[in-house]
């Protein structure tokens, strides 16, 4: 039988290798390390010594000492265990255990199995280990000893004869694996069974502990034991708990309604597919998306075809489309005539605001910075007992969106053209806006009081745009006026009222109001303020209103002169105070019945716009991705824009976004209506080289101090084109300068001189301009540039000179070049850097 190693014995008994090694040395075994092996007989002695704490006697003296009086108590007790079980238990209980168990969890659990155990024997029981490979752990089934302890004890009680060791004992096997069937080659010898019962525990408790210990042993050895199948069964049982794949649901889907605005993961849920499948399909089609991106209509249709599902695209904006809900509401028709809304448009400085000033008997133009209109204004004028609402729009090119907005809410458009200036770009643009809105156009030829006035020039220019006067057979009224003297103003107003009668403008004043925001701002002490024109219904103080993402209750109404109003009727304009935030210019405002309804509309619109913006920032095609990678060297100027009103802010943003090229662009990191706040300074300081641009606003003392502390530059303007020009200058400074060449002169080589330790010196005659020392030169041979470099030395006779003019001879040394030939030309030039202008 194979020898047993010290560490195997230590593992069985639950002691450390060091402790068992010391015990073995005490017994006189020749062992040095835990890997040292002992014979099965020595192993049995070591078991006895560790369990009982007494050294075994030598075989020669054992029979003699058993009869002596010194060993009388123990010897008598050891001869009786076969006769009475009780005496054996008492003897075992009285056996002292000198070695304390270790505190480690594994050692404690192992030692608890051995406490109070003894090898039942007559004279000497030699314990033989299982004859298996030494790498096999001996403790695999040691717990099984407890399962067979009762039966073995009964067998021992029946056997009256003392146990005599025979030659067979050398091949006896310990019953360690009786509870678990690992293989068929392990058997039990009834005569030579070693049992280690815990006699301090009742048999029932032993049996119960057996079951628990078996379960623990199986759990601990399941990962290392290839024969242990319980863990595998558990894993198989876990695998049964799988998510149910809804293949039947996928087969049942043949058509589905898809919202017009839907994110990718929502679309995947609708068609019972995973988001990864949809993303993979789009990637194959050349579109990189994330699960939160919105899908376009064509993408939805293509995906439906790819998955074999018929998709019906429906519009879900109805959830927050309060305008449609307003229009769908059927009420009794109590329509009455309303005031016409007239928009004045035209080129900058052609007299639009001056015309309105004369009509209103006011001086609005004098209050505008730079003498140009930079806000959309709405004014009420009474003529012949009838009200007319005028909208004054800016003529500067930056206010395209304002002009388009003014044309969309109007009934009649007056195009003002200066008689001394003719048709200009913004004149053409205004006409296009009016035609797009489908509203009548009246041409006012202004500045007729000037000597240089030429109305025919205006008519000819407009004829090229298909705007023909009635006297030329066209359908447009041309009215010569002077906003300065008042010539033709009455005629113009008469034509406006006549045109309004032909249009039969009507509205129902008895229902909830519907209005259009033409301008909005944030005013100190008043909060968000909006200028609106009521199209239908009547807006009253106390009404609950919603305008895009803004909502609230009307706290006050004012006319264009600042007078308080109780209500605004259809076709009239006024200033509304009481909104939760500044609404976008051009937004539609309606009255609703409850605050809850208004809040829900505004919140849904806000959530929709926010998700739309987030999705827009993440969408990118493969081609766009390549372009973005190529933009690694693209420079940008970060700016924060603050303006007094929404319309001006919109115009500034649109103008600055156009200021870009392949090298540089404007990066608007934040914009808003109202004054410059400390949070704006904090944001600007977090971005390198960020500039704050203010329009018609001024920073306060605290803001100025914080900006100075953080070195944030604030620039304020009251004329929009000054702001744009300054930004252009800033961008030009960031752009790479244009490098141009300036030719200085030319010389021809007459003789080449080789100077030792220096190289070649060219004897030249300056034929044009001058040759300068340190200047850049080119060596030209037969019209081809063969070298470019710098002049290293320039001499006239033996003197060093800085410059040699035309007609003089000189000696020229070229840095790093020694291949000059007679007849070559030396061209001198310098590089000049110039700033780029956008």
Curated annotation (Swiss-Prot):
| Signal peptide residues on this chain, from the entry's feature table | none
Annotated segments matching region G4:
446-449
- Annotated region (Disordered), positions in chain: 50-108
> Which keywords does UniProt give here?
Cytoplasm, GTP-binding, Initiation factor, Nucleotide-binding, Protein biosynthesis
Q: Which Gene3D superfamilies match?
A: 1.10.10.2480, P-loop containing nucleotide triphosphate hydrolases (3.40.50.300), Translation factors (2.40.30.10), Translation initiation factor IF- 2, domain 3 (3.40.50.10050)
Which stretches make up the tr-type G domain?
337-506
Q: Where is there biased composition of kind Polar residues?
A: 66-81
Residues at which GTP binds: 346-353, 392-396, 446-449
Q: Where is the composition biased (Basic and acidic residues)?
A: 54-65
Coiled-coil stretches noted in the UniProt entry, renumbered to this chain: none
- Can you provide one Gene Ontology molecular function annotated for this UniProt record? translation initiation factor activity
**The UniProt record lists the keyword Protein biosynthesis:** yes
Region (G2), start-end ranges: 371-375
Quick one: a GO cellular component term?
cytosol
Provide the protein's localization. Answer: Cytoplasm
Q: Where is this region: G3?
A: 392-395
Location of the region described as G1 in the Swiss-Prot/TrEMBL record: 346-353
Q: Where is this region: G5?
A: 482-484
Predominant location category: cytoplasm
Q: Which family does it belong to?
A: Belongs to the TRAFAC class translation factor GTPase superfamily. Classic translation factor GTPase family. IF-2 subfamily.
In UniProt terms, what function does this protein have? One of the essential components for the initiation of protein synthesis. Protects formylmethionyl-tRNA from spontaneous hydrolysis and promotes its binding to the 30S ribosomal subunits. Also involved in the hydrolysis of GTP during the formation of the 70S ribosomal complex.
NCBIfam families documented for this protein: IF-2, small_GTP
Task: Name the chain's protein.
Answer: Translation initiation factor IF-2
Starting at the broadest rank, the lineage of the source organism is: Bacteria, Pseudomonadati, Campylobacterota, Epsilonproteobacteria, Campylobacterales
């Amino acid at each position: 039988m194979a020898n047993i190693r010290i560490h195997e014995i230590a593992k069985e008994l639950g002691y450390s290798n060091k402790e068992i090694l010391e015990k073995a040395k005490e017994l006189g075994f020749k062992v040095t390390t835990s890997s040292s092996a002992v014979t099965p007989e020595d192993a049995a002695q070591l078991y006895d010594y560790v369990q009982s704490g007494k050294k075994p006697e030598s075989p020669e003296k054992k029979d003699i000492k058993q009869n002596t009086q010194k060993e009388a108590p123990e010897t008598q007790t050891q001869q009786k265990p076969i006769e009475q079980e009780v005496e054996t238990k008492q003897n075992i209980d009285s056996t002292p255990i000198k070695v304390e168990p270790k505190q480690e969890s594994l050692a404690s659990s192992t030692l608890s199995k051995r406490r109070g155990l003894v090898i039942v024997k007559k004279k000497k029981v030699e314990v033989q280990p299982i004859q298996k490979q030494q790498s096999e752990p001996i403790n695999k089934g040691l717990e099984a000893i407890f399962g067979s302890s009762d039966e073995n004890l009964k067998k021992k009680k029946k056997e009256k004869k003392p146990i005599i060791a025979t030659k067979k004992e050398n091949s006896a096997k310990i019953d360690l694996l009786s509870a678990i069937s690992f293989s068929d080659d392990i058997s039990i010898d009834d005569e030579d069974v070693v049992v280690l019962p815990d006699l301090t525990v009742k048999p029932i408790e032993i049996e119960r502990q057996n079951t628990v210990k078996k379960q623990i042993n199986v759990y601990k050895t399941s990962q290392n034991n290839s024969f242990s199948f319980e863990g595998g069964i558990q894993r198989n049982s876990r695998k049964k708990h799988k998510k149910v794949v809804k293949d039947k649901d996928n087969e049942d889907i043949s058509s589905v309604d898809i919202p017009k605005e839907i994110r990718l993961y929502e679309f995947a849920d609708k068609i019972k597919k995973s988001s990864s499948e949809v993303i993979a399909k789009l990637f194959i089609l050349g579109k990189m998306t994330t699960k939160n991106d919105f899908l376009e209509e064509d993408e939805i249709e293509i995906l439906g075809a790819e998955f074999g599902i018929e998709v019906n695209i429906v519009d879900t904006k109805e959830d927050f489309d309060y305008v449609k809900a307003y229009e769908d509401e059927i009420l009794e028709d109590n329509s009455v005539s309303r005031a016409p809304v007239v928009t004045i448009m035209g080129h900058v400085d052609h007299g639009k605001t001056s015309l309105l000033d004369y009509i209103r008997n006011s001086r609005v133009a004098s209050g505008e910075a730079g003498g140009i209109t930079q806000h959309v204004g709405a004014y009420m004028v009474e003529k012949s007992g009838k009200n007319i609402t005028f909208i004054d729009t800016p003529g500067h090119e930056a206010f395209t969106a304002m002009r388009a907005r003014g044309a969309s809410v109007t009934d009649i458009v007056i195009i003002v053209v200066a008689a001394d200036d003719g048709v200009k770009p913004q004149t053409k643009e205004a006409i296009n806006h009016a035609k797009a809105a489908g509203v009548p156009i009246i041409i006012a030829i202004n500045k007729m009081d000037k000597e240089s006035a030429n109305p025919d020039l205006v008519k000819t220019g407009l004829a090229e745009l298909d705007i023909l006067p009635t006297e030329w057979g066209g359908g447009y009224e041309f009215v010569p006026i002077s906003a300065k003297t008042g010539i033709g103003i009455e005629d113009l107003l008469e034509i406006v009222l006549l045109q309004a009668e032909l249009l039969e403008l009507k509205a129902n004043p008895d229902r909830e109001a519907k209005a259009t925001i033409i301008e909005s701002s944030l005013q100190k002490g008043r909060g968000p303020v909006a200028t609106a024109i009521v199209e239908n219904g009547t807006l009253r103080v106390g009404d609950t209103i919603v305008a895009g993402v803004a909502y609230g209750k009307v706290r006050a109404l004012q006319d264009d002169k600042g007078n308080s109003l109780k209500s605004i009727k259809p076709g009239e304009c006024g200033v509304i105070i009481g909104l939760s935030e500044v609404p976008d210019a051009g937004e539609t405002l309606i009255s609703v019945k409850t605050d809850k309804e208004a809040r829900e509309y505004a919140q849904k619109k806000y959530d929709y716009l926010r998700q739309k913006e987030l999705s827009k920032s993440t969408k990118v095609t493969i081609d766009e991705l390549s372009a973005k990678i190529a933009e690694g060297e693209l420079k940008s100027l970060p700016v924060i824009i603050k303006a007094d009103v929404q319309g001006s802010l919109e115009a500034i943003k649109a103008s600055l976004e156009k200021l870009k090229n392949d090298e540089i662009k404007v990066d608007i990191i934040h914009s808003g209506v109202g004054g410059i706040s400390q949070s704006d300074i904090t944001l600007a300081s977090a971005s390198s080289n960020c500039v704050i641009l203010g329009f018609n606003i001024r920073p306060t003392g605290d803001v100025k101090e914080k900006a100075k502390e953080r070195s944030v530059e604030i620039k304020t303007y009251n004329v929009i084109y000054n702001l744009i020009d300054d930004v252009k200058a800033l961008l030009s400074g960031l752009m790479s300068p244009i490098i141009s060449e300036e030719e200085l002169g030319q010389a021809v080589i007459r003789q080449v001189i080789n100077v030792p330790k220096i190289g070649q010196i060219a004897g030249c005659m300056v034929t044009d301009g001058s040759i300068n020392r340190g200047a850049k030169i080119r060596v030209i041979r037969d019209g081809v540039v063969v070298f470019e470099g710098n002049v290293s030395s320039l001499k006239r006779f033996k003197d060093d000179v800085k410059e040699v003019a035309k007609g003089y001879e000189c000696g020229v040394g070229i840095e790093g070049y020694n291949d000059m030939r007679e007849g070559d030309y030396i061209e001198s030039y310098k590089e000049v850097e110039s700033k780029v202008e956008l």
